């Protein structure tokens, strides 16, 4: 049984990867009176007088909402909120297993930015943090920005910042392994959506050489028509030599390739034109090039 079928069977068997468990056993009348009425009225009164006490008297301080609209799930695209639920459950399980943070999946059935923002804002008093997940660009940028302005709890778009942090850490190590100079790198990022743009900005802010963004049409250059606001913004600080062409053109002489796009877009022949290339092919669930193919093309370091 391959990994896909094994995972499907596991999900059928479990009927979901997370559950809500009470932290207070209710075995007696006194237990019930303390956890619920009438005793629960007192913490309610305390919070009503002092809002900050909600983080001490409820689970808010350790509870994160993992929220999607189902428009950019893995590499599957716009598959809808219900189909995004397995990923949201999985992320919640990771929060709990790796950080002991409780998390709750929420899938919003709307593609309207105002509706999504308002919905999340209205439920934000139930949580200590908001983790936005798998929301398509460019809508995701505005949603995160507005929620950060409106909410009094942390708001984090994982596909942007989580991915950027991990990629930067891996690239720093790859630079050491390949003995390249960080400030002189030519880095090609394929995929100019939420993840790609966030990675590009982060690497540029860290001082990584010349970052070249590519999308389905090829290299993105300042002044190009048809760019969305996120692409337009990063075009002013990337592609310093104003190169034009397709992905294959961008990879010639490149020190690093970072893929957050679609499967099988890169060949070993393209890798062979790179400069002792670092290849991070991260299209999910199938990468732009398989690791063995990248190595066969002469890649010096590979991540997937």
Regions found by a protein language model. Name each.
Residues 1-155:
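N-terminal ligand-binding/catalytic initiation module
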Residues 45-50, 237-243, 260-264, 284-285:
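Short gly/ser/thr-rich secondary-structure transition/capping motifs
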Residues 99, 150-151, 207, 275, ...:
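Short, structured coil segments at secondary-structure junctions
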Residues 124, 182, 250-251, 271-274:
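A short, aliphatic-rich alpha-helical micro-motif
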Residues 131, 256-304:
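ADP-ribose/adenylate-binding Rossmann-like module
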